[in-house]
Regions:
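Non-catalytic signal-transmission and effector/linker regions of two-component phosphorelay proteins
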Residues: 1-16, 20, 25, 42, ...
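Acidic, metal-coordinating helix/loop segments flanking the phosphotransfer/catalytic sites
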Residues: 12, 37-55
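Alpha-helical interaction/dimerization surfaces of two-component signaling modules
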Residues: 26-31, 47
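Active-site residues of response regulator receiver
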Residues: 55-61
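Receiver (REC) domain switch/output surface
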Residues: 87-105
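Conserved beta-strand-loop-beta-strand hairpin that lines the nucleotide-binding pocket
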Residues: 107-119, 166-252
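Conserved short strand/loop->alpha-helix "switch" segment adjacent to the catalytic nucleotide/phosphoryl-transfer site
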Residues: 135-159, 214-215
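Short alpha-helix lining the ATP-binding pocket of the histidine-kinase-like ATPase
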Residues: 159, 163, 167
Length: 252
């Protein structure tokens, strides 16, 4: 079903692979959206009215340093604040469609230990957008052999990190963005979650590993993150959280 003009989004796809670019544009057209494509960043920067776009989907592959066996496909999605206020439900559908399309395209037979993938997402602070992102990230980590989905609580840790950033960092303000970065390989998965909130004094966080704090309701999410992840680090201002997950055999 074609969406009405009021619900139609303007999407810019920047991708150097002809097949991937055409396929993704077709998928988004099928949802009823207006899609503009560019084969490289320089071409995209030459567009006259770049402010018209509600969503950007861009590859992040550095052709000078990456070869096909070493990197599958890195990409970035960024949504504007105006789009989040206008049609947050439609943005949810678009993001899940892009992630689903990418998942179908990149699963090719390659030695797992040579695959490296980087994902960057910029999303409005709305929790309804997060489930598809969570499922996608956990699936990618599982396919690289870092975890077994049925035995892992990685989904829980990432969910707690996203919820904390949206609710406590950005205070559910959809005009503020949540930035999520995932750097994935067969050896480790590094996740960074950054909000646009005012921050907080990291030193004031009760140590969730201290037995005196185990039964306190506050900080329960932080406790889960510390228990599930192998490394957890907050930035000095408290607006960025870095988490590392490794397979059992590679843990320090």
């Amino acid at each position: 079903m074609i969406k009405s003009a009021q619900e139609t989004c303007s999407i810019l796809v920047v991708e150097n692979s002809d097949d991937f670019r055409a396929g993704l544009a077709h998928e988004l057209h099928q949802l009823g959206h207006t899609v503009t494509v560019a084969s490289e960043r320089r071409e995209a920067m030459g567009l006259e009215d770049r402010a018209q776009f509600d969503l950007l989907v861009s590859d992040l592959v550095n052709q000078a340093s990456a070869t096909e066996p070493e990197i599958v496909r890195s990409f970035k999605m960024a949504a504007t604040g105006s789009q989040s206020r206008r049609a947050i439900a439609e943005l949810h559908v678009i993001i899940e469609k892009i992630l689903s399309f990418k998942l179908r395209r990149i699963d090719v037979a390659q030695p797992t230990d040579q695959i490296r993938e980087k994902i960057e997402l910029e999303l409005p602070s709305n929790l309804t957008l997060m489930n598809g992102v969570l499922e996608y990230l956990v699936d990618r980590v599982a396919r690289l052999g870092l975890i077994k989905v049925e035995q892992s609580n990685l989904f829980v840790a990432l969910d707690e990190a996203f919820v904390n950033a949206v609710k406590h960092g950005n205070r559910n303000d959809t005009t503020k963005l949540l930035r999520i970065t995932a750097e994935l390989s067969a050896h480790e998965a590094i996740f960074t979650v950054e909000d646009e909130g005012e921050g907080f004094d990291v030193c004031e966080i009760p140590d969730p590993r201290d037995s005196a704090n185990l039964f306190k309701s506050s900080g329960r999410g932080v406790l889960l993150i510390y228990n599930i992840m192998d490394e957890v680090e907050y930035s000095e201002r408290g607006t960025r959280l870095r988490m590392v997950k490794r397979p059992e055999g590679l843990r320090p």
